[in-house]
Design a protein with these regions (language model features):
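His/Asp/Glu-enriched, well-ordered alpha-helical/loop segment
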Residues: 354-364, 371-389, 393-394, 399-407, ...
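Acidic (Asp/Glu)-rich catalytic clusters
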Residues: 242-245, 268-277, 358, 405-409
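Histidine- and aromatic-rich ligand-binding microenvironments
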Residues: 1, 14-17, 22-23, 51-52, ...
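Short, flexible, mixed-charge acidic loops at enzyme active sites
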Residues: 293-301, 307, 466-473
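Divalent metal-binding segments
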Residues: 4-10, 15, 19-30, 34-249, ...
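Glycine-rich tight-turn/loop motif centered on a GG-T
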Residues: 298-311, 332-345, 385-390, 425-436
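Structural recognition of the beta-strand scaffold that forms the well-ordered cores
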Residues: 106-108, 138-139, 251-254, 390, ...
Length: 544
């Protein structure tokens, strides 16, 4: 509940207005609203309470317009695969977890990253089944786009390769036997099946507990509004029912009932339950994560091959070369292309998007590679959704791609928090200087509204960490990834506050008179890694 008293926060550094700017001073709040902002020396005298912040910073309430909130909530209660360093580690961990769990329970691991293994080779289905001993086992990697599953888990999810929209989402050997690696739709079906089985087994109180625990963690991280990029109707209903029990504002995009990656349809619209905190939206996936739809000059591919060869020689292992050729690469129109578009026919995409646009939905699109981003732009220019649109990721774009996208009016939701983890992979691809990675500055220059989001738990879910990486572009070794794409602290803070609202289809003008008193107090400059959020306020109430 909002504090009804007049409270003046003084002796602060205030990041206020739109566009955001800094000033020494503070602000006065009352009844859940900002009454005034003031410079140092002009503090109001007619207040019930005055809080001296001693030079701390006040920033607008932080948002995350792309955070897998419900999956993250479940992951906190299950096994962590991030420490695995080999296939044997994976199989040993699966075997041990299966020994210690009742036979009917799921065994779930997340955050696997086999690209960091000395020998980046995943277990086969036969090996997973041997370790699982007849149990339902599911392992998701860091992207939530690829995973491993036992035969029992696949059977429980009703997986059938030929019934998938993209049969290639279940890998096979040359002889047609299943390899055990699942992608996109197949991965999503097992994930949603497991999620329902797990939370239903524990009942309503457990469902509330895991959601409220995750909401509390978000508030502690200074988040005031979180948007889940895709939920089915039963989980939408769950969040809608729990919303009154947390001050964290929750919203979501509509997905199919079966999984996140298949295009939603008429039935998903009919059964949808929408948030009170954002316009209704629907999610379409145009490519994957590792399996992205992208192209680059042949010269970039040659650079990548040379580097992979040299790395393999210097490290005395085949890992770098194995990872390079893990994906299908074809020569098309004089460019090296990763041919992983989910919609081979753009007219099918236009038809599906038009249905939801005519129903008043905001269109949200996953497009990680530049080919997918251009397809998204062409679809949006044709459909022109009245509810607006957001396109997420756009990890690598050419200048020409950015020009095409700028004509759509859509928000670009980018995740610079991935820079420390993925900069090396981008450079190993030979993408620079032919493509712009995380092209925040280039998008801004072309007038594209930008949002900074996390894609948590796939990337860092700390909103200030993500904003900082947009400013400094730091890799793990301290050097910068394409420094020309740096943006200013004010631009970054705007992207993780007002930009987040724009991506969700809402409006936030920042800390200005008349606006909701939703803000965070930071111990120091928010762009110093040593600074931390010490208070979070939503609509005039301190929630952390």
């Amino acid at each position: 509940m909002a504090d009804s008293r007049d409270i003046a926060f003084k002796n602060a550094v205030l990041w206020w207005g739109s566009p955001i700017r800094k000033m020494q001073g503070g602000m006065k709040i009352s009844g859940g609203k900002i009454v005034s902002v003031f410079e140092k020396g002009q503090e109001p005298s007619d207040v019930h309470d005055a809080v001296d912040l001693g030079g701390r910073h006040i920033i607008p309430g932080l948002t995350d317009a792309h955070r897998h909130f419900c999956v993250t909530a479940l992951m906190a209660r299950h096994e962590d695969a991030s420490t695995w360093k080999s296939k044997q580690d994976a199989l040993d961990a699966i075997r041990e977890a299966c020994r210690s769990r009742p036979r009917e329970e799921w065994v779930f691991f997340s955050r696997m990253d086999h690209t960091k293994w000395l020998k980046p080779v995943l277990p086969t289905l036969a090996e997973v089944d041997s370790a699982a001993s007849g149990r339902k086992v599911f392992v998701s990697d860091t992207t939530l786009h690829r995973g491993l599953a036992s035969s029992e888990a696949m059977e429980r999810a009703g997986l059938d390769r030929q019934s998938l929209r993209c049969p290639g989402d279940m890998d096979t050997f040359l002889n047609g036997r299943l390899r055990g690696t699942l992608w996109e739709e197949a991965h999503g079906k097992v994930l949603f099946t497991m999620y329902r089985d797990v939370i239903d087994a524990y009942g309503d109180s457990y469902k509330r507990e895991i959601i409220l625990d995750e909401a509390k963690r978000c508030l502690q991280m200074s988040l005031t509004h979180v948007h889940d990029p895709g939920l089915p109707c039963d989980i939408q209903t769950l969040l809608k029912g729990i919303q009154p029990q947390t001050p964290l504002k929750l919203s979501w995009s509509v997905s199919t009932h079966e999984n996140l990656y298949t295009p939603p349809g008429v039935e998903d619209d009919a059964k949808a339950v929408h948030s009170d905190h954002a316009p209704k939206s629907v999610k379409f996936f145009l490519d994957g994560a590792h399996r992205t739809a992208a192209s680059m000059p042949v010269a970039a591919g040659l650079k990548a091959m040379v580097r992979a060869g040299l790395d393999s020689l210097s490290e005395r292992r085949l890992g770098p070369l194995q990872l390079l050729f893990e994906q299908k690469i074809v020569l098309k129109d004089g460019k090296l292309t990763l041919p992983y578009l989910r919609f081979q026919d753009i007219n099918e995409l236009k038809t599906k998007a038009s249905y939801f646009s005519e129903k008043g939905y905001r269109i949200v699109v996953h497009a990680l590679g530049n080919i997918a981003a251009v397809q998204a732009a062409r679809m949006l220019k044709a459909v022109r959704p009245a509810g607006g649109a957001s396109v997420e990721h756009m990890l690598i774009l050419t200048r020409e791609d950015i020009d095409v996208f700028a004509e759509t009016g859509a928000v670009a939701s980018i995740q610079p928090g991935f820079i420390p983890d993925y900069a090396d992979a981008i450079e190993r691809m030979g993408a620079i200087p032919y493509l712009k990675p995380f092209p925040l500055k280039s998008l801004l220059k072309r007038g594209v509204p930008i949002c900074i989001s996390s894609d948590g738990p796939c990337g860092s879910d700390d909103p200030l960490f993500n904003a900082r990486r947009a400013v400094d572009r730091k890799k793990t070794d301290g050097t910068m990834l394409d420094p020309d794409e740096r943006i200013s602290p004010e631009e970054a803070l705007s992207a993780v506050t007002a930009g987040g609202h724009a991506s969700m289809g809402t409006r936030n003008d920042g800390l200005v008179p008349g606006a909701p008193a939703t803000f965070c107090i930071v111990s120091g400059d928010p762009f110093l890694d040593s600074s931390r959020v010490i208070e979070t306020w939503i609509d005039g109430a301190k929630v952390f």
